[in-house]
Every structure is written in C-alpha cells, then in structure tokens.
Amino acid sequence: MKEYKDTLNLNTTTFSMKGNLSVNEPKTYAKWQEQQAFKRMQNRKDHHGDFTLHDGPPYANGHLHLGHALNKILKDIVVKREYFKGKKVYFTPGWDCHGLPIEQQILEQLEKEKTSLENPTLFREKCRDHAKKFLEIQKNEFLQLGVLGDFEDPYKTMDFKFEASIYRALVEVAKKGLLKERHKPIYWSYACESALAEAEVEYKMKKSPSIFVAFGLKKESLEKLKIKKASLVIWTTTPWTLCANVAIALKKDALYALTQKGYLVAKALHEKLVALGVVDSKITHEFNANDLEYLVATNPLNQRDSLVILGEHVSLEDGTGAVHTAPGHGEDDYHLGLKYHLEVLMPVDEKGCYDESIIHKKLLDESYLGEHIFKAQKRIMEQLGDSLLLEQEIEHSYPHCWRTHKPVIYRATTQWFILMDEPFIQNDGSQKTLREVALNAIEKVEFVPSSGKNRLKIMIENRPDWCLSRQRKWGVPLAFFIDKRTNKPCFESEVLEHAANLFEEKGCDVWWEYDIKDLLPPSCQDNAKHYEKVMHILDVWFDSASTFKAVLEDYHGEKGKSPSNVVLEGSDQHRGWFQSSLLLGCILNNQAPFKKVITHGFIVDEKGEKMSKSKGNVVSLDNLLKKHGSDVVRLWVAFNDYQNDLRVSQTFFTQTEQHYKKFRNTLKFLLANFSDMDLKNLERSHDFSPLDHFLLETLETISNEVNSVFEEHDFVKGLNILMAFVTNELSGIYLDACKDSLYCDSISSEKRQAIQMVLLVVASKLCYFLAPILTHTIEEVLEHSEVLCAFLQAKDVFDLKDINVLEKLHLKECKKPENFEALLALRSAFNEELDRLKKEGVVKNSLECTIEVEEKALCENLVEELLMVSSVGSANEKISETPTFTLFKAPFFKCPRCWRFKSELENTPCKRCKQVLKERQ
C-alpha cells in the first residue's frame, strides 16, 4: 500500500519542545542587555502615558532568597504588563546600604581577625566595601530572574548624592518644626546598643516572671483614710524595673476594695485575685480611686516613696487595677509622669546592665552594679521578701530586636524624634499634624488587597513619635550642631546647605573626619568654638523613606515622576517602608509618595511553616533556577495567590513546570501549523467557518476577562482563564476538530488558511498575555516565527502590543453558531458512547462512525468536524442508538491519506485527497 505521509501538511517549527531554559535564558538576557532593552521600554515613542513603579530597596547584605525573587518578579511582571499595554515605564532598582546588619558583619570579621578599628572613617569604609560586594552579587542574581530595570544606574543609599538627598530631606523636616530632641523612653536593643524604631521591633513569645507585690501606704496616707494598715498590690512582668518605680496608677472613678489582711485592689478584680491566692476574700472597706489620688506608698525594694496617681491606661480586665509606674521604662508611664511631674529614673546602661545611678539614687545596693537586668530579676524577687505575694511564670508576646532577635527594653534616653502630633503649615496655609495629614493621604491611595488600607490607618493612628537617632556608625549622620551657649540645635539654612553640599561632593564621612570649623561655611566659622556635633546616625528607615525624593524628585532618571504609580512589597512593610515613606511624603509634599500599594505574602514551606536553615526546609533559589529556569520560577510566582503566604516545595515547582510545558507545547503547535502561510495572506480577509467564529468569540471573551483581572494584578486568575481556554476550547475542541483540514487540505484551501489566521490570532494573544511573565520564552517564540513577527509587525518581544482581533481579521463581529451549546452536549454524549464502543471492540476510533442526529437543526458540517466522524447521515450497519443520536459503521472505505472513511474504493484516496494530490504534482 502506498505511503501518503509525505503528502500531508505535517509542518514543523524550529521552536523546540524542550526549552533548556537554564542554558538559553542567560543568552537571551545578554542579548537584551546588549540591545539596551530597558532603554527601549523607557524611551518608546508610540506611548500612551508613563508608568513608574518605585522599588523598595532590599538590603545589600547576603545572597538572594526565594522571598527576594517573589518580590522582584512581581514588580517586573507589573512593569512589563504596563509596557506591553503601551506605556513608557520607569523602574530603577535600588539598595539599602546603611545599617546594623552590615556593621555586625564587619565587627564579626574584625573579631575573627582579632583586630579592633576605632577610626570611624576606616570602619565606615569597610562597611561600604561590604555593601558594594553584596550589591553586585544581588544585582547579578536579580538579572538571572529575567528582571528588567535600570540596572546600569541603580540607586544606592550610600552614594554621595543620595546621602546628601537624605540629609536634605532631614533638613526639611527640621525646618517644618517636626524634628525635636527629647528625653523619653524608647525601644532599646541592648544586644546592638542602639535605639530602635517601632518598625524594627518584632513580637515573639517569651517566658517572663509574673509577680504581685504589696506597696504599703505610709502613715500619713493611712491617717487620711482613717485605717490602720493598707498595701496597694501591683502586678508586673518586669521585676527589673521595680527599682525605678516612682508611682502607682489607679483607674479614675473605679472602686477599690481593702481586704481584712490589708490589701488594696480594684474591686472588679478582687474575686480573680482571691482565686489566684494573692489576697484574702473578706472586704472591710471600699474607696473611690479619686479619694486615693496623691497618697504615698513605700517601694519595698528600696524604701523610696511611690505616689498614687490616676491613669486612663489602667485596665480592670487583668492585673490588680494598681499599675507599677516607672516613667523611664514605659510610654504610658512617661506621659503620665509628665502630667504629675514625676522623676524619670533610668538606672540601666546601653548594654542592659544596672549603672551607677542605682547607688547615687539609692535604688539598689552596689552589688547590682554592672549586672544584666534579666539576670538580676531572681535576686530582686528574693529581696522583696514578704511583700512578694505571688510569683508565677507566664509566656507572652514580647518585643524583640528584629536584627539580633533578642528581647528589647523600654529605656529613657535623649533621642531625636519626628513628632506625630505637632501642627505644621500645609501647602494651603492651614495647620495640621503629621498624623492628620497621613490619615487623609491614605484615603487617596488604592490598596491591593483593599484590607491594607485599614491596616496602615490603624498603625498611623496608634504609632508613637518616630525615633530617628541611632547610636551607631554606618549611616547618614544627624548632622546638626548644638550651640553650647543655648543647648539648642543650629538650623541656619546656610550652615545646613553647606553640610549637604559637602556630603554630595565628598560623602558624609566628612562628618567624622573634619573639624567643626571645616564643616561650616566661611561666614560662620567664627562660631565653631561654640558648637558641638551631634554624633548619632539616622534610622535606616529614614534612608529608605526618602528614596522617593532622591529617585523621583531630585537627581535620578525618574525625576518628576513622584508620586509613583505603584509600590509593591511584602505585607510587613505596612509597619516599615510604606509607613515611613508615607510620613516623609506627607511632611515634604503633603501627600503620599505613591498612588497604589500592592502587598504580597511570605514564602513558607509546604506545611505553611516559616523557612529556616535549622529546620532544613529552605528551598534554594539557585537550585531552582538551575533545575527549572527563571521562566518556570516566574510562572510559579504568577500562578500563585501572592496576596497570601506562598507554600513552596519541589512538588509545587514540578506542577508549575507542567503548566509551563502546556503553554510551550501549545505555542509550538500553533507556530508549526501556520509556518507555511504565505505572508501575502496576512492582510486580506478570509471566509471563517462557524467553528472559527466559535473560537474567535471565545478568544475575545477570555481576552476581556484576562485584561480585566490583570488590570487588578490578579495574575493567577488570569493565568487560570488562559490555561482553561488552552486546555478546553483551543486544544480540546478547536484544534482537534481542525487537524484534518490543517494536515490534509490543500495549502491553498481557503478553509485551511482561515484556520491558520485563527491560530495566528490565538498565538498573538497568548504571547501578549504571557510576555510579562514568560518574557524569555515569548522572545524565543518570536525568534522562531517569521509569520508571527510579520503579523504583529514585531522584530522581538519588546515590539509586542495587544491586537484588535476584529480589525486584524476584517470582521464586524465574531459570533458562534446557534445551538452551539447543544452541539457541545451532543459531543459529550457521543464521546461517552464512543468510549463504550471502543472498550467492547466495536470500533477503534470516531472516524469509523457515521452519525444520525435527532436534532435536525444542527449543522451537519459542524457535527462532522466536532465529533470527528466520517459523515453525518444513516447507513446500513447500526452499532448504537441513544435518545439523541444513532451511530452506524461508516459505509465507505478508509482513505489511506486522511484516514476518514470516505473512499469509494479500498486503498484509494478519497475525493478531497485526490484533488490535493493532483495540486501537489
């Protein structure tokens, strides 16, 4: 029997089924760099507006992990999506270069080398070199992810111009009257010997002592109440602060019960305390808290006086209703202390050890000098003697330093703060507080997910003043001079601008290198003898908060692009970068520095647990890239609900690889089957069949859906729509039905050429939607298809744009045939019956069948194509009968070329195939 395989249109494509991504992607990216692809994205002429995504800076320390990849890939997808929509895009990657982690790395290095480095400039030089090293490492690792941006000129917070911009932002804060030096309690990390901002504190579970202590009322107070004996009972989980107690706060207007044994507690808590065994049950007297104000008790630890005061923060839900008050160790205590003019005792040094003030102030005996506060607690509790009514251990949520993961303490020190509740002049001349301006600004920002708005609002409503100063070396200095004559900072414009210019020219190391005279402008140098330098550095959150100013307003390539269209970071940045940027934007410009905030979750293992080296559940980014390639990692990011935590395991990436293969193989099939198209046919109109119209209408519908959800940055929903279309309507229905025409019709067949145009349009749409995600792969698709490039008028992926299907195909509308749903129902029932017949050995495939359909209104050609039967009608040999159709053995012979049972003679081509063979001669 003659072979006809070579007469079929079994077209091929050079686009490989195997992507070999880890080998090919670096070559593609190198080509993009050589061709300056991102500059094309920035400088496109046919644009429809601008789009700026401002990059929240990662820290220039260590290698990238999967969390970094998630963040940067999402940003890249968002930026590319806007580019392919027709916009000029701006994305300058940046790095946060100052701060404690780098200092710690250098200190550890010096310790290993058994050397010390007292010279601050040399120490800062080592820090700078460390940041440079890891900045380059991370930059190259980002490039491996297929991320495009202005990597030739990224922003770095340690660049001289950038340091000057940060300092100028600080100067503006000072000039608006919002920067003040104050002595108040702040979060203090004894592990790194520095103040911490609220954003640098994380909460973890900690075991602490829980003690109830009796403070006996003094004789004069007892006489005032006309009682012989009474002790206020306080509850605390920080026994180490008892030596700094100066007051006991009660709840205003609340009732307090005196027990028979002389213990005074809130009546509302009496029964709870009896159950705990803290106090006895019999109540002998009741007092209103207001009548107890200004009584005096005795601290049993050091016999110092403790004033009875009233406080709004006192709870009647737990404790005793009598709150131990030490203004040096708590925010509420401090503010209440201001009201009552209480002494602020601070007997703890920067290392968390008791200092000499315990002796001078007679707070503790000298045996505690130099002892760490947490170590001293056991002795303190022993020293309380009978005044310690109950000692327990509790596990509770406690603030920890986010860098060292050690507990932090509240410690009153002199620091610099940005004031949240100090009115300052707005652009319209009115006066509002920073808190008010920030809360108003939030209302004008779009949040994805929307819950982010309320989360940020609550944080702004409740946050304290922003502690800016740090007692470290590697950072931008709080470069102010204190006038020793007035003890006030010098905020003269000439002095401040001179310092900023020095920083811009020589870097802010000069603050440590130069004498005061050399830091002053010539006209002010006579005052040098009256000045002293502030030697604190700035909170690194102020560095990163000011990035919008440097990048979008001052000197960078994106100048004039503030506020940015989008910022996109992890959900923890509501308390970090989003918040600090918002506050600084509201100070400098009376508005948020961004229009939209998008947040993503965190990377966790397949059980939902946080990844850590100790657990052995870390998935290596480097290994993933080597095994799967960056486009698979990018598809994994996009195919997940990134707004929640993302679970990771090798299994998830294997599943993603299957999704990738489905898209790739579909594109390969499409490319192969329109590869023989005559380019002259691309612009003319075609006669599209009802089946073509079905697919085109479906394509239009899903395109609108995908555009809509992609606009909301819901990439997983969009990809699921695309995958369902590719699997069901495209592969499962249309391509199955069209293979006969594609393979067996004449190349000049109008029907086949119309199908090819449909495939071309589908490929165009898939490339457009997938390009922001699978950029390497879509570049490869275009490299291997002259026809697709000609159709799209694109030489590479960066020329891609969306197409109007109707315009491209010269159609007024795409409308699927009437009764098409009935056809699909018939197809489903037919396939079910066909499976039964195959199992019973009656037929081997659908082509052996002829079908007679009860619903006569159904188009015969469509029935034949969709069901892939050889003909529609009746025949002699009935093989099956159902309520909706009857199946017969096809009455003709099998065509040896197309395999349909349409030949009149055995081993002879059918009429259609004879005509095609004749044309091929």
Swiss-Prot record:
The cofactor binding remark recorded in the entry reads:
Binds 1 zinc ion per subunit.
Instruction: Give the reaction(s) catalysed.
Output: tRNA(Ile) + L-isoleucine + ATP = L-isoleucyl-tRNA(Ile) + AMP + diphosphate
Instruction: Tell me the SUPFAM superfamilies matching this sequence.
Output: Anticodon-binding domain of a subclass of class I aminoacyl-tRNA synthetases, Nucleotidylyl transferase, ValRS/IleRS/LeuRS editing domain
User: From which domain of life does this come?
Assistant: Bacteria
Its GO CC terms are: cytosol
Q: Name one Pfam family in it.
A: Anticodon_1
Tell me its cofactors. Zn(2+)
Q: Residues that bind Zn(2+), according to the entry? A: C895, C898, C910, C913
Q: Where is this motif: 'HIGH' region?
A: 58-68
Q: Where in this protein would one find the motif 'KMSKS' region, according to its record?
A: 610-614
Cited InterPro entries? aa-tRNA-synth_I_CS (IPR001412), aa-tRNA-synth_Ia (IPR002300), Anticodon_Ile_BEm (IPR033708), Ile-tRNA-ligase (IPR002301), Ile-tRNA-ligase_type1 (IPR023585), Ile-tRNA_ligase (IPR050081), M/V/L/I-tRNA-synth_anticd-bd (IPR013155), Rossmann-like_a/b/a_fold (IPR014729)
Q: Which GO terms describe its biological process?
A: isoleucyl-tRNA aminoacylation
Residues bound to ATP are K613
Domain comment? Answer: IleRS has two distinct active sites: one for aminoacylation and one for editing. The misactivated valine is translocated from the active site to the editing site, which sterically excludes the correctly activated isoleucine. The single editing site contains two valyl binding pockets, one specific for each substrate (Val-AMP or Val-tRNA(Ile)).
- Which protein, by its recorded name, is this? Isoleucine--tRNA ligase
